[in-house]
Amino acid sequence: MSDNAQLTGLCDRFRGFYPVVIDVETAGFNAKTDALLEIAAITLKMDEQGWLMPDTTLHFHVEPFVGANLQPEALAFNGIDPNDPDRGAVSEYEALHEICKVVRKGIKASGCNRAIMVAHNANFDHSFMMAAAERASLKRNPFHPFATFDTAALAGLALGQTVLSKACQTAGMDFDSTQAHSALYDTERTAVLFCEIVNRWKRLGGWPLPAGEEV
């Protein structure tokens, strides 16, 4: 492992993983059959002192894939009209291709080896993104096929809250419930929450590891 003084890089902090915050809005709960309707991604960076912060934001409204299910209950919940021409929706391929292109550049620039998804209740977002990547025959998917950083679990440990809005408020962050269930807003809040948890652990002395505990 590097000397403590050198542990200010993303690649050192997360064992070579490049964290990317993701949130999706969908037309149901089944990643194989229900439409992906919106996706946002935020890459992260560290400053020279090793503090984590948001970096680049990408956001796309997505066209339902051919034959996709559109559950009325899900659409009522997130307020998305898939047929609204003003959404400016793009294909799954276009959205994921652009996200992955930026992510691959970030991996290279940071000296990391692979991207890892950060999301709130991450299994849901991960399953939809991976299913969409498979449908789009996306080449060179930079994301780990199953590992994630789940901010619901991390916030439960660090803050005693698992609901995104309550975790943000407990951490001293603003949360506007009227903007919730927008992929862009939820990704922004999740990114700031993840950074706060990581940085709080650093402020408390948990990172870098004390001498003798490095591996």
Curated annotation (Swiss-Prot):
Which cofactors does the annotated protein need, by name?
Mg(2+)
Details of cofactor binding: Binds two Mg(2+) per subunit. The active form of the enzyme binds two Mg(2+) ions in its active site. The first Mg(2+) forms only one salt bridge with the protein.
Q: What is its EC number?
A: 3.1.13.-
Q: Name one GO molecular function term.
A: magnesium ion binding
Question: Which residues of the sequence carry a binding annotation for Mg(2+) 2?
Answer: D23, E25, H181, D186
Q: Name one GO biological process term.
A: DNA replication proofreading
The domain of life for this entry's organism is: Bacteria
GO cellular component: a single term: cytosol
Q: Note the site residues: Important for substrate binding and specificity.
A: F29, F77, F124, F146
InterPro entries to which the protein is assigned, alphabetical: Exonuclease_RNaseT/DNA_pol3, RNase_T, RNaseH-like_sf, RNaseH_sf
Q: Where is the active site?
A: H181 (proton donor/acceptor)
Q: Which UniProt keywords apply?
A: Exonuclease, Hydrolase, Magnesium, Metal-binding, Nuclease, tRNA processing
Where does this protein hold Mg(2+) 1? D23
Q: Does the keyword RNA-binding apply?
A: no
Q: Which residues form the Exonuclease domain?
A: 20-194
In the record, the note on similarity to other proteins reads: Belongs to the RNase T family.
Function per UniProt? Trims short 3' overhangs of a variety of RNA species, leaving a one or two nucleotide 3' overhang. Responsible for the end-turnover of tRNA: specifically removes the terminal AMP residue from uncharged tRNA (tRNA-C-C-A). Also appears to be involved in tRNA biosynthesis.
Q: Which NCBIfam families does the record cross-reference, listed alphabetically?
A: RNaseT
**The protein's assembly and partners:** Homodimer.
> Know the name of this protein?
Ribonuclease T
